[in-house]
Swiss-Prot record:
InterPro entries: MinE (IPR005527), MinE_sf (IPR036707). This is Cell division topological specificity factor. The keyword Cell division applies. Prevents the cell division inhibition by proteins MinC and MinD at internal division sites while permitting inhibition at polar sites. This ensures cell division at the proper site by restricting the formation of a division septum at the midpoint of the long axis of the cell. SUPFAM superfamilies: Cell division protein MinE topological specificity domain. The gene is minE. Keywords: Cell cycle, Cell division. It comes from Herminiimonas arsenicoxydans. The keyword Ribosomal protein does not apply. GO terms for biological process: cell division; regulation of division septum assembly.
Length: 88
């Protein structure tokens, strides 16, 4: 009988239980945040990358992070000037 119990163990695996607990902890931490830390750095990097190709005013790049149900949506709006391409 011990062999059958070992082969057909019905107890939940500890790895699965740990995974579920970790997912709960991560979900709670995400809900508790007031705002993402990475947005200022992302904004600076986007300005640098876009400026390589187009002369753009840094104030014309807007970034926002919105929650829609279980999803987080990152919106990036760039106002591009007409005929102001930078030659690489």
């Amino acid at each position: 009988m011990a062999l059958l119990s070992f082969l057909f163990n019905t107890k939940p695996k500890t790895a699965n239980a740990a995974k579920e607990r970790l997912q709960i902890i991560i979900a709670r931490e995400r809900n508790g945040r007031t705002g993402p830390d990475f947005l200022p750095a992302l904004h600076k990097e986007l300005i640098a990358v876009i400026s390589k190709y187009v002369k753009v005013n840094p104030d014309d790049i807007k970034i926002s992070l919105n929650s829609q149900g279980n999803l987080e949506v990152l919106d990036v709006n760039v106002v591009l000037p007409e005929d102001e391409l930078v030659k690489p």
